Amino acid sequence: MKLKFFVLALCVPAIFTTHATTNYPLFIPDNISTDISLGSLSGKTKERVYHPKEGGRKISQLDWKYSNATIVRGGIDWKLIPKVSFGVSGWTTLGNQKASMVDKDWNNSNTPQVWTDQSWHPNTHLRDANEFELNLKGWLLNNLDYRLGLIAGYQESRYSFNAMGGSYIYSENGGSRNKKGAHPSGERTIGYKQLFKIPYIGLTANYRHENFEFGAELKYSGWVLSSDTDKHYQTETIFKDEIKNQNYCSVAANIGYYVTPSAKFYIEGSRNYISNKKGDTSLYEQSTNISGTIKNSASIEYIGFLTSAGIKYIF
């Protein structure tokens, strides 16, 4: 499947090269557009643990949630030939952002639907998040008022969290939810990092009416490589998960207004989703120096929303 994707990516320019006239140079340094914007990022990621020897049932889930994290975003688009363009873009958060985390366990196999342990960590932060993207666009329709094209690209997204303090309810010594307490507010409890590597294909479209322009983009991937690192500071245990060939879908839309022939103010919103899928876990206990790998024992699911407003300039 990966080979098919990269073949498609390489073929996009070739498909449309035949449409270029002999008077049109292969590269046009002047035909470049740039954009910069400020925006907001909200999302939720679910980190799950399963017990392979008990039918693969879920035994733990950590929900990391954040809202309205401030981001700065930028991009460059370069028309290589009339119907093919190359783009580079990315965004990053600005400083620590407020978040929350809930950790829930189901340790009793006799009542697998009833949670046994739960902790709440309102003093959680999204320490940083960022993304970069490379893509090629091949335009099937390329008129002044409307465009429709194929897109093939690659993007990487990173997220880093830190949970401090928190309160808990645990089941201990054969009891049920019989221990309640709280961690010191300044004590580190869990650190969590994610990395998503996403080759994708999709469709992109634009429509212009007078000074208004509308755009939409749909991206899909079945080849996502996800990985994470979960560090429990109290037990000195590190979990590393890897999930291959997850599904990814992104839908984006924007509207803009040209204040000059070369400058456009715009607003944009997107929804990004990576579906849940099981993978392998590697664990390491620092205190005992014990390590191991468990197959089909972890999963990652992610949903995120990004909105931004900015300016695009065409040279």
Curated annotation (Swiss-Prot):
InterPro entries: OM_adhesin/peptidase_omptin, OMP_A26_sf, Peptidase_A26_CS, Peptidase_A26_omptin. Induction: Transcriptionally regulated by VirB (InvE). Its main location: membrane. One of its GO terms (cellular component) is cell outer membrane. Its EC number is 3.4.23.-. One of its GO terms (molecular function) is aspartic-type endopeptidase activity. Residues 1-20 form the signal peptide. Changing residue 182 to T: In plasmid pINV_F6_M1382. Keywords: Aspartyl protease, Cell outer membrane, Hydrolase, Membrane, Plasmid, Protease, Signal, Transmembrane, Transmembrane beta strand, Virulence. It is found in: Cell outer membrane. GO terms for biological process: proteolysis. The active site is at 103, 105, 230, 232. It comes from the Bacteria. It is a multi-pass membrane protein. Pfam families: Omptin. Protease responsible for the cleavage of IcsA between 'Arg-758' and 'Arg-759', removing the entire alpha domain from IscA localized on the bacterial surface. This proteolytic activity contributes to the maintenance of a tight polar cap of IcsA, which is important to Shigella actin-based motility. Belongs to the peptidase A26 family. This is Outer membrane protease IcsP. The gene is icsP.
